[in-house]
Amino acid sequence: TPDEGDWSARRNAAMQVWREWLPVGEQPWKTYEFGDLGTYFRTDTRMIARSKPYWAGDLMRAPDPAKAFADFRDGAWMDPASTMFGTEQESWLFHQFARNKATWTVLGTGTNMGYNYTPEEALNWFSPETPDYRKNFMRQGIAAAKAGLPYNFDNWGGYPVARSRVFKAAQKNDLNLVVVSGDSH
């Protein structure tokens, strides 16, 4: 949000802290091989090159939110140019997939790859004292689900074509893929 300060400054500070406190080095993505048992791919889906995410709140403010969600689902949501990794990292990953011969392939991403949908009854989960902004967030998720969309476009749920490319690359190379991810709250 605008009151949190300049995005670039916050991102740069976060990246500096990440590198100073975690033993990951300067590389934003990397391969770790464990003999023929497994290969782990550490990727970046937050800071480097992903496409700008869409926000359900913007669609809710449209004159006809249901139409806005449907138009988004049938249009921008399916944009083949949309990416979580960026072209360079995605190319690197798919090349690594092609050369990987390990029994297990573990892909680490900063955001969930599974889709999450908000059920209509979710509004009943709140107490009467719950602030409206929280209820409105839930309404956004419900509106998205009614259009067949996941509630969060800021994770892989907002990048279905890019997500499909990852899974197709794993299938093409007959990998036993396990995805581990974070940032679920």
Label every PLM stretch briefly.
Residues 1-185:
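Metal-dependent phosphoester/phosphodiester hydrolase catalytic core
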